[in-house]
Amino acid sequence: MLSTLACVARYLSGKEPGSGFWRVERESNGSEKIAIWDASLGPMPTQVEIDAAALPAVKAYRIPFNRAECSRRIFERYPAGRQLSALAGLYDSANVATMTDWIAACIAAENTAADAIEAATTVQAVEAVTVAWPV
């Protein structure tokens, strides 16, 4: 998961981590700084710009991150072929119900987390949101 400053750099630059356009490094005291900011992105963001972008940047990162994790969990447990077979009626209703209930629970857990992230008013509140994935 990206740090807050990395989320901000991604948000402000429109470039993904590892693209070579920017890099966040941890200093010896544990704080982070933007170590590389490509000139094609414009001037390096000021601390005021970083602070202003922190909340929307973290929200813009965490919601899709959780959605991707939801999809990963669903397809890991129930690959597309198995889901299609269930849809085609090749599994008994008890197995289909178990599968659809679990998938629905995953989606509901992710949606609950997304709602909490959207409602958050601080970066700390966003970072405190966890997804209660079904087992």
Locations of the language-model features?
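A preference for well-ordered globular domain cores
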Residues: 1-135
